[in-house]
Amino acid sequence: MPDLALEFEIGGIVCGIDEVGRGPLAGPVVAAAVILDPARLPKTLLERLDDSKKLSKRNREELAELVPATAILGFGEASVEEIDRINILQATFLAMRRAYDALGRECAHALVDGNRPPGLPCPVRCVVGGDGISLSIAAASVVAKVRRDAMMADLARAHPEFGWERNAGYGTAEHLDALKRLGPTPHHRRSFAPVAQYMLF
């Protein structure tokens, strides 16, 4: 389970940053930056926060409602157009920088999930598997996941055939079948091979 050991080791104001949505065929990539206040963290968050991929949808949503009361949050996203123009890695870094900027605070350090730094105005420590190690990164992973899932559910209302409210834009059989039958929507990443093969022009 993640804890605050890295945050305490570094000291000062530390934010955790994570993203969701690098792999999907549709929708934006979304990042969150979170500064936790250790003195105000409820036991519920300390005991239940984990890598968002290990939590049920219900647990993620419950935790995402609790985090803002004891944290400073910043969100950033990179659009489908930006993903197609600058590639998914650079778009991920862009979303992370936007999330950091949205905090409105200068941090002594940022803990970033992954092995490549996004280029921030403060020192960065990359933590592979960070959402299972750092509580700040875990919080960022949960709130980013819940936010992006809600965005994809909204987009699904206009394009119900793709099942985005269930698959969040990932290349499930349902999604790929609809893509083959109907072709890409404006929300698809045209630079991704499974989408590009169904483009008419």
From Swiss-Prot:
Residues holding a divalent metal cation: D18, E19, D113
Gene3D superfamilies: Ribonuclease H-like superfamily/Ribonuclease H (3.30.420.10)
InterPro entries reported in the protein's UniProt record: RNase_HII, RNase_HII/HIII, RNase_HII/HIII_dom, RNaseH-like_sf, RNaseH_sf
PROSITE patterns in UniProt: RNASE_H_2
Top-level taxon: Bacteria
Signal peptide: none
Entries under Pfam families matching the protein: RNase_HII
Function: Endonuclease that specifically degrades the RNA of RNA-DNA hybrids.
Protein name per UniProt: Ribonuclease HII
